[in-house]
Amino acid sequence: MSDNDELQQIAHLRREYTKGGLRRRDLPADPLTLFERWLSQACEAKLADPTAMVVATVDEHGQPYQRIVLLKHYDEKGMVFYTNLGSRKAHQIENNPRVSLLFPWHTLERQVMVIGKAERLSTLEVMKYFHSRPRDSQIGAWVSKQSSRISARGILESKFLELKQKFQQGEVPLPSFWGGFRVSLEQIEFWQGGEHRLHDRFLYQRENDAWKIDRLAP
């Protein structure tokens, strides 16, 4: 098969979206109410990693980057994730805190996009979550200098065993280079797939202490 033939096959991959629609009359005033409902349904549908979200950032040259992390908490203040503070995404957030999040619930023909500003969590918040993690995950946080170049996986595995021995007694301390971010809720868009590509899109945009809701063309 030539590259062109393969490209033509990819171009014809499509399906109809038939899971259901989203109507303005059914929308709650608060987007978190709808987000919680959709997240709960994603969990009930046993989707793999329903809390997985794409985090998009940009560097100082305007180059965008994306990666998948796990949502660990959400409320009216924002959505929370944790990471190595020496990572590429953490450095980019320090330089430009404006980010977007995307929850891709393909099986349910849904996606949710969040736009806001990321801010560092307090040490107390980070410590509380860090010590709730499995012990091996706590040790793993110490091992990797995230986004740095390494010559082989064995380096990580050897370091893990070394630190597991070092921390075998007592509590694993919180690394100074490990933390979290809370992304504020400025805009939240809900997308529901529709037949004939007539998808339903609704944008919640914060205006003072209320939410403005607009339907967007697909």
Swiss-Prot record:
Quaternary structure and interacting proteins, as annotated: Homodimer.
NCBIfam families associated with the record: pdxH, PRK05679.1
Which residues are listed for FMN binding in this entry?
Answer: 67-72, 82-83, 88-89, 111, 146-147, 191, 201
The record's Gene Ontology biological-process terms are:
'de novo' pyridoxal 5'-phosphate biosynthetic process; pyridoxal phosphate biosynthetic process; pyridoxine biosynthetic process
Additional info? Can bind a second molecule of pyridoxamine 5'-phosphate at a non-catalytic site in a cleft at the protein surface.
Give the reactions, separated by semicolons, that this protein catalyses. Answer: pyridoxamine 5'-phosphate + O2 + H2O = pyridoxal 5'-phosphate + H2O2 + NH4(+); pyridoxine 5'-phosphate + O2 = pyridoxal 5'-phosphate + H2O2
List residues binding substrate.
14-17, 72, 129, 133, 137, 197-199
Q: This chain belongs to which protein, by name?
A: Pyridoxine/pyridoxamine 5'-phosphate oxidase
Organism of origin is Escherichia coli (strain K12)
Please give the annotated consequence of changing residue 197 to E: Reduces affinity for substrate 8000-fold and catalytic activity 16-fold
Q: How is the cofactor bound?
A: Binds 1 FMN per subunit.
